[in-house]
């Protein structure tokens, strides 16, 4: 049975028996674990089940309660591994399990496959009375994380910030840490509720409408509030500028990459194959290299360690600040957006408006999982003929041009093939998208 996807285990109505087996499998190779959970109603259930498996296999467990993923990832340094019970931005009926190494990086596919093999092949014998693990409760994890982050910040301006936590795990950290950083904070959806009563945890324009309206109302009196909004486990963030605009993920990432290079003198940054070419355009001016990797925080973290770059980010709002820690951190990212504003002495909307605007198009096409490889093989061969270019196959199939690019990639969690296009001219973007869609459909049909 395949359990792990592109971001750990994530399922609708996650079975506690699966959680138990995961815990028992972990105990085969790890004897000291720290575990946390987000606000989902099934969090206690899944945590209890995975803890039972760990204990049965002789693994000692420290529970740190309801915390964001960055707190869990930071805490993992004192243990053999960290276990986060979360389904991130998914609706409340979902839950999941994401595993972290001591250095804060998420488990890679090889590590997950090893666990999967144990789960699928082990007989799950009962532990003996003299080899059962123990449980310890630690209530200092949030405090320790917050103190560490604040020690590494450089913010002198008292910013006005609306913090939207989605009734999720960010509630226990974000409002307080922004306040301690000197901000005047207005909290929205900041009480923990695993039903996500205020909004769904995906921080997109549709879900953030009420928060946008609040910011527009506040700024009608020239108060210059910006917004920071999280997903379900606060490993991501998106910003809302003073004009009440939910910032474009690509533009915010490009602006921040430029800031990192200008402030630190960094000679490279890491991003993914689906990130905007605005990043390349921005950083070429400073002679900095853009290193692209597969989509996903695991790949970004691996490349950061390999290249020594201090920052890596995805255009989903998943950013890793290697100079602080290697876990994706939406709380730290939000605070560093404020650092960027202070560095430039500009409002957020002014910084974002300086980023080049390109034509972006996205489509997803239904495709049975068993046909995905057939489609990608066809796209690679046919695309090379049509575009007269060798395909880039780091993650999916990408063709790059002077004025744009197209990426065709199978979804790792759904029965779709995704087509992403970016171009400097609208006509070229539409032409690329039309060609991409046609290739995918032909690949599905097998003709």
Curated annotation (Swiss-Prot):
Pfam families: PGM_PMM_I, PGM_PMM_II, PGM_PMM_III, PGM_PMM_IV
Cofactor note: Binds 1 Mg(2+) ion per subunit.
Key words of the record: Isomerase, Magnesium, Metal-binding, Phosphoprotein
Family annotation (PROSITE patterns): PGM_PMM (PS00710)
InterPro entries: A-D-PHexomutase_a/b/a-I, A-D-PHexomutase_a/b/a-I/II/III, A-D-PHexomutase_a/b/a-II, A-D-PHexomutase_a/b/a-III, A-D-PHexomutase_C, A-D-PHexomutase_C_sf, A-D-PHexomutase_CS, Alpha-D-phosphohexomutase_SF
Positions with a binding annotation for Mg(2+): 88, 231, 233, 235
Maturation and modification: Activated by phosphorylation.
Record-listed E.C. numbers: 5.4.2.10
Sections of the chain in a coiled coil: none
Residues annotated with Phosphoserine modification: 88
Source taxon at top rank: Archaea
Reaction it catalyzes: alpha-D-glucosamine 1-phosphate = D-glucosamine 6-phosphate
Record's keyword annotation contains Magnesium: yes
Known cofactor(s): Mg(2+)
PANTHER family with a match to the protein in the record: PHOSPHOMANNOMUTASE
Family: Belongs to the phosphohexose mutase family.
The protein's role, per its UniProt record: Catalyzes the conversion of glucosamine-6-phosphate to glucosamine-1-phosphate.
Name of the featured protein: Phosphoglucosamine mutase
Organism of provenance: Methanococcus maripaludis (strain C5 / ATCC BAA-1333)
Native organism taxonomy: Archaea, Methanobacteriati, Methanobacteriota, Methanomada group, Methanococci
Gene name of this polypeptide: glmM
């Amino acid at each position: 049975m395949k359990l792990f996807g592109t971001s750990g285990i994530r399922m609708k109505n996650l079975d506690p028996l699966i959680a138990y087996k995961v815990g028992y499998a972990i105990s085969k190779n790890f004897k000291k674990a720290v575990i946390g959970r987000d606000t989902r109603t099934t969090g206690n259930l899944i945590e209890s089940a995975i803890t039972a498996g760990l204990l049965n296999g002789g693994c000692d467990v420290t529970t740190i309660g309801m915390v964001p993923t960055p707190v869990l990832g930071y805490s993992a340094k004192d243990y053999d591994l960290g276990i986060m019970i979360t389904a991130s931005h998914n609706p409340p009926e979902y839950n999941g399990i994401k595993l972290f190494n001591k250095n804060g990086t998420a488990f890679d596919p090889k590590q997950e496959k090893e666990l999967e093999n144990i789960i699928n092949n082990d007989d799950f014998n009962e532990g003996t009375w003299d080899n059962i693990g123990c449980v310890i409760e630690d209530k200092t994890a949030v405090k320790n994380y917050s103190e560490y982050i604040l020690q590494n910040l450089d913010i002198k301006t008292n910013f006005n910030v609306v913090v939207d936590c989605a009734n999720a795990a960010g509630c226990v950290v974000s409002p307080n840490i922004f306040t301690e950083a000197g901000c005047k904070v207005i909290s929205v959806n900041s009480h923990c509720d695993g039903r996500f009563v205020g909004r769904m945890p995906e921080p997109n324009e549709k879900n953030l409408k009420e928060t946008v309206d609040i910011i527009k109302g506040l700024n009608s009196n020239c108060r210059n509030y910006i917004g920071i909004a999280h997903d379900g486990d606060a490993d991501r963030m998106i910003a809302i500028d003073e004009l009440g605009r939910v910032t474009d993920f690509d533009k915010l990432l490009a602006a921040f990459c430029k800031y990192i290079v200008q402030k630190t003198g960094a000679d490279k940054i890491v991003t993914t194959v689906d990130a905007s070419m605005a990043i390349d355009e921005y950083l070429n001016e400073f002679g900095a290299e853009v290193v692209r990797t597969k989509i996903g925080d695991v790949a970004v973290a691996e490349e950061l360690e390999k290249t020594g770059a201090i920052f890596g980010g995805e255009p989903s709002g998943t950013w890793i600040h290697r100079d602080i820690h290697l876990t994706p951190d939406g709380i730290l990212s939000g605070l560093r957006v404020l650092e960027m504003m202070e560095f430039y002495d500009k409002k957020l909307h002014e910084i974002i408006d300086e980023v080049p605007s390109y034509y972006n198009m996205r489509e997803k096409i239904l495709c049975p999982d068993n046909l995905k490889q057939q489609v990608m093989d066809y796209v690679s061969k046919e695309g090379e003929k049509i575009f007269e270019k060798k395909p880039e196959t780091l993650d999916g199939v990408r063709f790059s041009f002077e004025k744009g690019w197209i990426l065709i990639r199978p979804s790792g969690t759904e029965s779709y093939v995704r087509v992403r296009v970016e171009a400097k001219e609208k006509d070229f973007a539409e032409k690329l998208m039309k060609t991409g869609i046609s290739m995918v459909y032909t690949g599905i049909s097998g003709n």
